[in-house]
Amino acid sequence: MAGTANCIDILIAIILPPLGVFLKFGCGHEFWICLLLTFLGYIPGIIYAIYAITK
């Protein structure tokens, strides 16, 4: 269901941001953006993953 996230989703997004986004959206553009941001810096990847999962 879009717009909802439980504690496990958020925890996975903090530990490994691309995995959290992949589990929620699959291999779409959200995943690739998160992967790129995680490679550029771990914190931007976390911020984007939490944003994408909770929006």
From Swiss-Prot:
Tissues of expression: Expressed in shoot and root of cold stressed seedlings.
Ranges that cross the membrane: 8-28, 31-51
Keywords: Membrane, Transmembrane, Transmembrane helix
Conditions for induction: Early induction by low temperature and abscisic acid (ABA). Late induction by drought and salt stresses.
GO terms under cellular component: membrane
Membrane topology of the entry: Multi-pass membrane protein
Location(s), subcellular: Membrane
Role played: Plays a role in the regulation of membrane potential. Could mediate a proton leak.
Family, as annotated: Belongs to the UPF0057 (PMP3) family.
Protein's name according to its UniProt entry: Hydrophobic protein LTI6B
